[in-house]
Amino acid sequence: MKWNPLIPFLLIAVLGIGLTFFLSVKGLDDSREIASGGESKSAEKKDANASPEEIYKANCIACHGENYEGVSGPSLKGVGDKKDVAEIKTKIEKGGNGMPSGLVPADKLDDMAEWVSKIK
């Protein structure tokens, strides 16, 4: 019995196409997790119960510093003396001038703005 020499190449091509299709479908399934940065629903529940200080440590410390002194973002010390709570809330909510928006859950904006205004 004589085999066609193209059969091994054909089998490899079919296997490659099948593997590519499978990995593409798998990637689409994982896209939601990738888009959320790997956070699960339990992380969302944790954020809902987080204190302003915990939210700060999770989202703000990289730019505003461990002691609120400012790193790449401005210092938060005494910001309550310069701006009222409503202005601080708007800044946290909408961002601007290099600050991203949406870092604080909407239901925690008032608590966070009040907390930031009291930093001395």
UniProtKB/Swiss-Prot annotation:
UniProt GO cellular component terms: plasma membrane
Q: What are the alphabetically sorted keywords of the record?
A: Cell membrane, Electron transport, Heme, Iron, Membrane, Metal-binding, Transmembrane, Transmembrane helix, Transport
- Which residues fall in a coiled-coil region? none
Record GO terms (molecular function)? electron transfer activity; heme binding; iron ion binding
Membrane topology reported for the UniProt record = Single-pass membrane protein
Q: Establish whether keyword Transport is in the entry.
A: yes
Which residues bind heme c per the record? C60, C63, H64, M99
Subcellular localization: Cell membrane
- Cystine pairs annotated here are none
Its post-translational modification remark reads: Binds 1 heme c group covalently per subunit.
Provide the membrane-side ranges marked Periplasmic in the record. Answer: 26-120
Q: Which domain of life is it from?
A: Bacteria
Known role? Not essential for growth on minimal or rich media.
Q: What is this protein called?
A: Cytochrome c-550
Q: Which organism is it from?
A: Bacillus subtilis (strain 168)
Q: Which gene encodes it?
A: cccA
